[in-house]
């Protein structure tokens, strides 16, 4: 009898010790994750030097709250509303829209990653699609032009091309603008071909656990330790497979353009500017983002390969290289390798407007 009691006490003691260990580790994990959860590069950036820091921190917190649907399209959960960012009932950033296109309306979707979504924009109107909408609102074209922000954080051609064909076509768009390139360059080739291995599986498990238990941080620390604190979704820079990634990019968008033609939908594929592209002299603040990691220096060079193969998109009537968009701008534009603030979004939108306006007038 006493032996059984002893076993029970030992078992109970063992459980208590494990609980204490888990609790201590979770406390450490919570402290470790504070900076991860609340930091945004734009808060201390010259890009927003005239905006109070408390407002920028509020923006940062809102962007961290945005939830994604972890499907093959990397869509955004619908109906998320904050002060600086709003997601409508279809999962697009900005105001509500109808599935059915209104009469006398030229409907445009802008597809891309976080730079299209506007991960540092001070409002929905100050994203690239938002500024583009303002430009068309001021134009006298004899019809309504509707610009819809279909950008999603982390999106690249592997997720975007199916998203265009399977989801956006149902909204009867007249034009779909593809504004990307950076994510395709940076994301590992293994992610492009669905061979992410143990690292990718661990990333997915931690992500799914976070959806179930959003306040439990231990899995994140374990993941970062196992992955040596690398971006496990994007992987590490792999220049050896760059040509293969470029080929996949061409294949995906050329196929999407073919499908669009069959539905009388126009596609306009654009290569985005990032820090280091074009002939612009970067500022001292921006320079720190290039020199802190040797991989960063190679990314803008790699992006040029995507611009070089634009002519190979034979089924895409419209394509453009926007990597020189900021050539004549001396002020700080980027707060990291590819993200810009409101001013950068406005400059990009003005360039896109000049390219798209003739397409609408021709239509």
Give residue ranges: language-model regions.
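N-terminal Sec-pathway targeting helices
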Residues: 2-19
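Histidine-centered active-site loop/cap adjacent to the catalytic His
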Residues: 11-14, 24, 249, 309-318, ...
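Membrane-interface motif at the C-terminal end of an N-terminal transmembrane signal
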Residues: 22-38
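Membrane/wall-proximal cationic-aromatic binding patches
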Residues: 37-122, 126-135, 139-140, 329
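Loop/turn elements at helix/coil->beta-strand transitions in domains of secreted/extracellular proteins
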Residues: 105-106, 141-145, 171-176, 261-268, ...
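Internal alpha/beta domain cores that form substrate/cofactor-binding pockets in large enzymes
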Residues: 107-109, 135, 144-171, 176-223
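Second-shell loop/turn segments in exported
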Residues: 115-123, 149-150, 240-246, 296, ...
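Serine-dependent acyl-ester chemistry module
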Residues: 181-309, 327-331
